[in-house]
């Protein structure tokens, strides 16, 4: 057996329909598009959300909410990321130096994901309950 002799089992593959290629194809002449009308034309059809001129649902319903600008400059940090920080004190500047958060970041919160292997002091960062328990269990402390 060679790669160039491999072929699928007889009858396991069906030839795809080729619209507009004659009466015998089952999709000849109009190619399954019917006669005339917008949807029969090339490039025809209406845009997403168009309801034939009726005021569409997305315009009938009111706008709501907004995206907080604070969320754009807030980062979530995993416990396992703390291993990449040099030194025993972790604050926003040491996280930026270790490339864990971006330069634009102004706030950060440490979440319980992974585990902390050594005692670290967290300074000026928010910490979730689970992460706080894990840090203190490893001998670390949190300074507000």
UniProtKB/Swiss-Prot annotation:
Residues 1-53 are annotated as: Disordered. It holds the Pfam family Ribosomal_L27A. The keyword rRNA-binding applies. Keywords: Ribonucleoprotein, Ribosomal protein, RNA-binding, rRNA-binding. InterPro entries: Ribosomal_uL15, Ribosomal_uL15/eL18, Ribosomal_uL15/eL18_sf, Ribosomal_uL15_bac-type, Ribosomal_uL15_CS. GO terms for molecular function: rRNA binding; structural constituent of ribosome. One of its GO terms (cellular component) is cytosolic large ribosomal subunit. Signal peptide: none annotated. Residues 21-31 have a biased composition (Gly residues). GO terms for biological process: translation. NCBIfam families: rplO_bact. Belongs to the universal ribosomal protein uL15 family. HAMAP family: Ribosomal_uL15 (MF_01341). Binds to the 23S rRNA. Part of the 50S ribosomal subunit. This is Large ribosomal subunit protein uL15.
């Amino acid at each position: 057996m060679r790669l160039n002799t491999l072929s699928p089992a007889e009858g396991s593959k069906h030839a795809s329909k080729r619209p507009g290629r004659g009466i015998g194809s089952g999709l000849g002449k109009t190619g399954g598009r019917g006669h005339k009308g917008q949807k029969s034309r090339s490039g025809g059809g209406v845009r997403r959300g168009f309801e034939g001129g009726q005021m569409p649902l997305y315009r009938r319903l009111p706008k709501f909410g907004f995206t907080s600008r604070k969320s754009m400059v807030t980062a979530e940090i995993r416990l396992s990321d703390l291993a990449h920080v040099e030194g025993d004190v972790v604050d926003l500047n040491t996280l930026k130096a270790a490339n864990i958060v971006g330069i634009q970041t102004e706030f950060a919160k440490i979440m319980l994901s992974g585990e902390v292997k050594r005692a670290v002091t967290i300074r000026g960062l928010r910490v979730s309950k689970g992460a706080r328990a894990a840090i203190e269990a490893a001998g670390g402390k949190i300074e507000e």
